Amino acid sequence: MTQLKQARKGIVTPEMEAVAKTEGLQPEFILKGIADGNIVIPANKLRKNLKLCGIGKGLSTKVNANIGTSTDFGSVASEVEKLKMAEMVGADTIMDLSTGPKINTIRKAILENTCLPLGTVPVYQAAVEAKDHYGAMVKMTADDLFGAIESQAKEGVDFVTVHCGVTRQVIDTFKGQGRLTDIVSRGGTFTAGWMVFHGAENPLYEHFDRLLDICREYDVTLSLGDGLRPGCIADATDRAQVAELLVLGELVKRAREAEVQVMVEGPGHVPLNQIEANVRLQKSICEDAPFYVLGPLVTDIAPGYDHITGAIGGAIAAAAGADFLCYVTPAEHLSLPDVTDVRNGVIASRIAAHAADIVKGVNGAAERDHQMAIARKKLDWETQLKLSLDPEHARVTRDRFKTRGKACSMCGDFCAMELAEKHLGVSVSRC
């Protein structure tokens, strides 16, 4: 029985209780959110010792870290190292986006080495295996694709990105639209390429009930991918993107009717003035399904710093109602990320998530900032470090220059906090 089915029966599951405890909320709040479809708990029923994570309305904004090999680079050891770094700096979930050799071995190693919910894009496995077996990705069969989905579900994968909304009608809209960057989603490109080669409908859309059967059996959460997400700000919120979103809205309804948990993925590259509108549009069309956004990146001209462009967009999107941020690393658009990129990407997205949670009124978010302000007024460095999102980095930075007094090396004897207390009588007790 899925979490959604149990919620509709009024059954508070151990998973709901665990999420409620983490969020500082009542279990009944989580139950209602799942029953209504605006909260999901990605938790394959076969996973053991899972660190449960609730995603959706009224909960803290969550952060996902993508890892995985490419055709030319990556190994089990390197991906496990990235995984451990992502865990250490506070990622809530992991996605394995491997497309390199030993794709199944990599995924199994990640599952064995993490307690975080794991997501995948099963079409990657199907495409890699089709290239190996048939000589071309487009020669995979629908059975190959569904076989990959089911095998990953049996392994314990908790959520799957599936590009069900890339339909023949949506592709026609895309062709008529005209874009600068065409299709930038790998899964979207694989799917569209297969459809053109075979002259057939997207099997994930045509046989959506088959997909639902697999997800219901293992309680795998569907993450409806945005195969036509904009790849530059000039393409943002165009007809092709919206056409796909309309299809996803229909599929959200069908998933809920089948008692399968579902969330929806979103853009992409979006200028600042369109982000809130994108969130509102998704929430309306998809009936408040949890919204999982990549960034969004607010400018195209910052390669090497896209963890910053993504964090800017992510903060605005989450404050407007997005629930789940997929991190962006400094390596975005340039290379496969290394372990340092993973660290920087997670931290940047966690900053964005926390900033948004203050706006949302998430339990405890603003209080943490209040406690930080008190610690700063007291020049209580240990408490400041403890409260920081990245204590290790903060400590290293603090210790670079030793000072004689309590003030930092920026101000020294001219510390504004110390001078205010000394000459104006403004003590910490007023905080």
Swiss-Prot record:
Biological process annotations from GO: thiamine biosynthetic process; thiamine diphosphate biosynthetic process
Binding positions for Zn(2+) per the UniProt entry: 269, 333
EC number(s) given by UniProt: 4.1.99.17
Database matches in Pfam families: ThiC_Rad_SAM
Cofactor comment: Binds 1 [4Fe-4S] cluster per subunit. The cluster is coordinated with 3 cysteines and an exchangeable S-adenosyl-L-methionine.
Pathway annotation: Cofactor biosynthesis; thiamine diphosphate biosynthesis
Cofactor(s) needed: [4Fe-4S] cluster
Residues that hold substrate according to the record: 66, 95, 124, 163, 185-187, 226-229, 265, 292
Ligand binding ([4Fe-4S] cluster): 408, 411, 415
One annotated GO molecular function: 4 iron, 4 sulfur cluster binding
Reactions catalysed: 5-amino-1-(5-phospho-beta-D-ribosyl)imidazole + S-adenosyl-L-methionine = 4-amino-2-methyl-5-(phosphooxymethyl)pyrimidine + CO + 5'-deoxyadenosine + formate + L-methionine + 3 H(+)
Function: Catalyzes the synthesis of the hydroxymethylpyrimidine phosphate (HMP-P) moiety of thiamine from aminoimidazole ribotide (AIR) in a radical S-adenosyl-L-methionine (SAM)-dependent reaction.
Assigned protein family: Belongs to the ThiC family.
The protein's name in its UniProt record: Phosphomethylpyrimidine synthase
Organism, as annotated: Dehalococcoides mccartyi (strain CBDB1)
UniProt gene name: thiC
